[in-house]
């Protein structure tokens, strides 16, 4: 009798994980509500023809900076030797109809997903360009950006933040007397990075 009871208990316990696994849905959905997203755009306007001469924009989610990131060990563990999504939720996107030169590298007009890569020693940061077609083909979410093949990178310079950015802030600034020379700025908490952009645009 004891053997039968023990066998019954064993079978019952063995079935519990299988039942739990069967009750878990194989597919779930997230999102659907408006996200907190930002957009930095530079538009060139031909005043003679009264029409656009070209433009480029970076669209991105705005994650909130957390005080825990100010712990150097924690921040290094998150970023050293890794590519960060540089945003939240959907991919950060560069959409340009103009040829650009970013940190000295030619970037053809087109559509790119962006990330930030930090070197293994933590001394260098670079802007990572990812082919959206390859991401779509592999169904990769920005959360898993380190699974996405990086097409190329351009260096970014570390800057001193004027103030702590509570949310990720990406800006494109330019002097009024030289509008083809644009500075890309990425600010998040105590992190501040910049890269020069030269824009090719006809009058």
Regions found by a protein language model. Name each.
Residues 16-20:
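Sec/Tat signal peptide C-region and signal peptidase I cleavage site
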């Amino acid at each position: 009798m004891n053997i039968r009871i023990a066998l019954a208990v064993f079978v019952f316990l063995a079935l519990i994980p299988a039942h739990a696994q069967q009750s878990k849905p194989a597919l779930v959905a997230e999102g659907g509500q408006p996200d907190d997203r930002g957009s930095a755009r530079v538009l060139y306007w031909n005043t003679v023809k009264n029409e656009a001469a070209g433009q480029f924009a970076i669209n991105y989610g705005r994650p909130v900076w957390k005080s825990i990131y100010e712990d150097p060990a924690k921040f290094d563990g998150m970023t050293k030797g890794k590519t960060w999504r540089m945003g939240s939720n959907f991919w950060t996107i560069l959409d340009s109809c103009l040829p650009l030169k970013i940190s000295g590298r030619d970037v053809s007009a087109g559509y790119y997903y962006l990330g930030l890569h930090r070197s293994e020693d933590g001394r260098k940061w670079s802007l990572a360009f990812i082919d959206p077609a390859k991401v779509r083909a592999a169904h990769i979410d920005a959360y898993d950006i380190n699974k996405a093949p990086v097409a190329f990178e351009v260096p970014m310079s570390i800057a001193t933040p004027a103030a702590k950015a509570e949310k990720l802030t990406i800006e494109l600034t330019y002097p009024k007397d030289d509008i083809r020379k644009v500075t890309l700025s990425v600010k998040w908490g105590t992190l501040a990075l910049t890269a020069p952009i030269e824009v090719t645009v006809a009058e």
